Design a protein with these regions (language model features):
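AAA+ P-loop NTPase catalytic core and its hallmark functional loops
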Residues: 1-158
Length: 158
């Protein structure tokens, strides 16, 4: 993950009615500036009100949100489009067979420092996402390997 410093808390409030186009008096926390992890806005995207409000509640109260549905129905895209309008960083992790516990947690890596090789811990996506305000989307959840799912379950329970 990038070493770019992310804002730690939303610094503005936006109108849900103006931003998402449906009746609501809710204001949602958002970021005034984009960074490299903010998805691109699809101006033609149509939001489902109930799903959008659930996602916004997750952002507002730092809660995990589970969105389920058939393959290809736009679950991940919905989260990304909400995040895009809030300038909220969003990272999608595909849980296919190529992801490992090391990718999630981190690993020791050999790096050069002052002309010498040293071993340094490089954190994975989970420690990084816990330390930063990020929407972490686990895609293809049912395809995750048991060892990977064990790590994710521990995070979801915390």
């Amino acid at each position: 993950m990038s070493s770019q410093q992310l804002l730690q808390k939303p610094d503005i409030k936006i109108s849900v009615k103006q931003t998402f186009g449906f009746e609501s008096g809710m204001k949602a926390g958002a970021f005034s500036k984009k960074n490299e992890y903010v998805p691109k806005i699809d101006p033609n995207y149509k939001f489902d009100k109930d799903t959008t409000l659930a996602i916004l509640a997750g952002f507002s109260f730092n809660k995990r949100v589970l969105i389920q549905g058939y393959h290809g129905t736009g679950k991940s895209t919905h989260i990304e489009q909400v995040a895009a309008r809030l300038n909220w960083p969003c990272v999608r992790v595909n849980l296919d067979s190529h992801i490992s516990r090391i990718d999630l947690i981190g690993k020791d890596a050999i790096v050069l420092k002052d002309g010498k090789q040293i071993t340094e811990f490089k954190e994975g996506i989970l420690p990084w996402s816990i330390q930063n305000p990020v929407a972490l989307v686990f895609d293809e959840y049912d395809a995750g390997r048991p060892d990977v799912m064990f790590v994710i379950q521990r995070v979801l329970e915390s």
